[in-house]
Amino acid sequence: MPERDPILLTPGPLTTSRMTRDAMLRDWGSWDAAFNRLTKSVCADLVRIAGGGDAYVCVPLQGSGTFAVEATLGTLVPRDARVLVPNNGAYCARIAAILRRLGIAHVELPFAEDEPASAHAIDAALARDARLTHVALVHLETSAGLLNPLDDIAAVCRARGKALIVDAMSSFGALPIALAASGIDALISASGKCLEGVPGMGFAIVRRSALEAAEGRSPSVALDLHDQYAYMQRTSQWRFTPPTHVLAALRAALDQFFDEGGQPARGARYARNCATLVDGMRALGFEPFLDARAQASVIVTFYAPADPAYAFPAFYAAVRDAGYVLYPGKLTTADTFRVGCIGALGADEMRGAVAAIGGALESLGIAMR
């Protein structure tokens, strides 16, 4: 009898619906008109979800979300620019690492791993250093599940006349984002996160004028967003072999997203999942790492048990044997593990996950109190 697919309690890849998986059973010709129409429809819907309007365009890119982050920074940020990077986790640090490799001057503004980036502190940093031209912000820092105040920070950038580039990898589709109203210059996300597609395609939703001004700027051929967009406009095709099955799955996932009720309904389901998870884990003796005011309903970081009998690999394996896949911790200040609340899941799956975790504690002899 075949093994049942595990339920992925991770922030991507994640558990997808049967309809999304079935969409990958068809083969597509990458130059075929039907596939070109698929690309166009997906891009139009992504701009619509972001609240971009006619002033914004979507540029899809093969690869993981980080490919799209590097492509966006390398294309939109001039080499003589200076970027402020609020840093409260591993994915903020990754932006700084990309800028370093690109040779772009940047300033990291440090925050604790459980501290949302402060719009006031960002405003003060911009006031101190007139050379700063851009802010590169992670909306939802997935290393802890920490939500940064995007609207407040966008307002500061607007008031200061600074360009704002947002890594919305783990928030897009789940949390409200109004691109045009916020004045954001670029937003980056990926197929395999809160849209509930499969991994393999990133995308940037970019202010058209900013993209048009970036011709020839990227140091990369494959990661040149301007060239990718210009080629698509001329030919309706991708420059290089596209992830055809990934795009087809994303089209199916977007259809389900709209059928569910769009971002408000998707966000509400994730919030119910998160509340069910946290309540159940607290009943077992676990405590979340973050204060509830800073917690996003996408992934929750829990303190690991203090019992010496606890070791994450054995704990992970026991929960995996029960049919659920956890995510290791990514913090530098505490021993933690993470549990995702996203994917084609509801409260029943979250209760099942809590039961599996409770069973792992019992089988491994781990005391919580």
From Swiss-Prot:
The modification N6-(pyridoxal phosphate)lysine is found at K193. One of its GO terms (biological process) is organic phosphonate catabolic process. The keyword Ligase does not apply. Its cofactor is pyridoxal 5'-phosphate. Belongs to the class-V pyridoxal-phosphate-dependent aminotransferase family. PhnW subfamily. The lineage of its organism: Bacteria, Pseudomonadati, Pseudomonadota, Betaproteobacteria, Burkholderiales. Its EC number is 2.6.1.37. It catalyses: (2-aminoethyl)phosphonate + pyruvate = phosphonoacetaldehyde + L-alanine. GO terms for molecular function: 2-aminoethylphosphonate-pyruvate transaminase activity. Keywords: Aminotransferase, Pyridoxal phosphate, Pyruvate, Transferase. Homodimer. Transmembrane segments: none annotated. This is 2-aminoethylphosphonate--pyruvate transaminase. It holds the Pfam family Aminotran_5. The gene is phnW. Involved in phosphonate degradation. Gene3D superfamilies: Aspartate Aminotransferase, domain 1, Type I PLP-dependent aspartate aminotransferase-like (Major domain). InterPro entries: Aminotrans_V_dom, NH2EtPonate_pyrv_transaminase, PyrdxlP-dep_Trfase, PyrdxlP-dep_Trfase_major, PyrdxlP-dep_Trfase_small, SP_NH2Trfase/AEP_transaminase.
